[in-house]
């Protein structure tokens, strides 16, 4: 686009303004609405920003391939423009959609401005749905576990050299980096309680052993942040978002992320039931028995590593 994406008072924290948005939506999406509405959305912990763009008048809206009128969409604003069409988010998005896995459609990418125009998958995350309909908690989590097994099965066995996830993994070095990051930024900085050299050495030895055990596991495609805030609940289906850091790792990694979620409390009995359900689906999908003792051990070790990393 030739229109400068200059922000104005109506678009706080955006690198674009009303003129840019009006011209872009008309040229790319054929929107004819007199008034375009833009609201900033609550994002994740990253430097990305999110905006919902909609029009009040839906006459003459653009039709996508499925002939569904696009009445609203999401703009994902990168921390800063990256002059590359194939950023990790887009490569992984294309890969997931090629496997018929639920991920938002990418309509347009303004490379110079670092703005991605994405399908609007609604306002309800799995977390929202769980709190709104607590009576459906078991059914909703079973749905999330089913999607996880489907994602792991399809993505693990469909290796694509263009997908960045296959070029990175949870090895000992990566797992220990996350552990040391927690020590430096949580224990030392946030708690202001730096460990002495001896205590840090002892703790490091314990975690090295734990990380070596985890790293021996068979590698699966992992979302890396598969939890209730990164699953949108859109018209009865769950949709994957925030998957740009996907990598190879133990199958338990995403299951721990889901069932040991810091945003939603799950009763221990339901956790056990869902682990059993996951193992049953996994055995059915792969056609072989799971070593349950080993599986549970890695699940527990992964729970320690994952939750310390997340503090």
Q: How would you label these PLM feature ranges?
A:
Residues 180-190, 251-288, 301-310:
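Active-site activation/catalytic loop segments of kinase-like enzymes and analogous catalytic loops
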Residues 47-54, 151, 207-255, 262-265:
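Active-site acidic catalytic loop and adjacent metal/ATP-binding pocket
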Residues 21, 25-31, 156-168, 173, ...:
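An alpha-helical support segment within catalytic cores of ATP-dependent transferases
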Residues 74, 102, 116, 220, ...:
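Protein kinase-like catalytic core scaffold
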Residues 36-51:
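ATP-binding glycine-rich phosphate-binding loop
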Residues 27-36, 99-101:
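Short secondary-structure junctions
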Residues 51-60, 64-177, 181:
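ATP-binding pocket architecture of kinase catalytic cores
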């Amino acid at each position: 686009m030739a229109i400068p994406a200059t922000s104005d008072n109506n678009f706080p924290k955006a690198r674009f303004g009303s003129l840019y948005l009006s011209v872009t939506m008309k040229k790319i999406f054929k929107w004819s609405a007199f008034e375009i509405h833009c609201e900033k959305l609550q994002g994740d912990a990253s430097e990305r920003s999110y905006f919902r763009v909609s029009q009040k008048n839906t006459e003459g809206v653009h039709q996508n391939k499925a002939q569904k009128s696009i009445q609203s969409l999401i703009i994902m604003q990168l921390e800063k423009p990256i002059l590359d069409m194939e950023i990790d988010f887009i490569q992984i998005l294309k890969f997931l959609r090629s496997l018929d896995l639920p991920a938002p459609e990418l309509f347009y990418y303004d490379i110079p401005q670092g703005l991605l125009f994405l399908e609007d998958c609604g306002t309800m995350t799995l977390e929202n749905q769980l709190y709104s309909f607590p009576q459906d908690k078991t059914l909703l989590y079973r749905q999330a576990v089913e999607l996880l097994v489907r994602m792991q099965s399809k993505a693990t066995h469909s290796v694509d050299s263009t997908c960045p996830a296959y070029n990175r993994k949870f090895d000992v070095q990566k797992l220990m980096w996350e552990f040391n990051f927690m020590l430096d930024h949580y224990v030392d900085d946030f708690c202001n309680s730096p460990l002495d050299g001896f205590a840090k050495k002892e703790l490091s030895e314990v975690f090295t052993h734990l990380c070596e055990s985890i790293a021996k596991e068979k590698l699966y495609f992992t979302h890396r942040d598969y939890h209730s805030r990164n699953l949108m609940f859109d018209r009865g289906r769950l949709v994957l978002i925030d998957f740009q850091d996907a990598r190879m790792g133990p199958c338990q990694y995403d299951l721990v992320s889901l069932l040991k979620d810091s945003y939603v409390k799950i009763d221990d009995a339901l956790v056990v039931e869902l682990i059993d359900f996951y193992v049953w689906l996994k055995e059915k999908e792969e056609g072989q028995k799971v070593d349950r003792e080993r599986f549970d051990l890695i699940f527990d070790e992964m729970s320690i590593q994952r939750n310390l990393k997340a503090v």
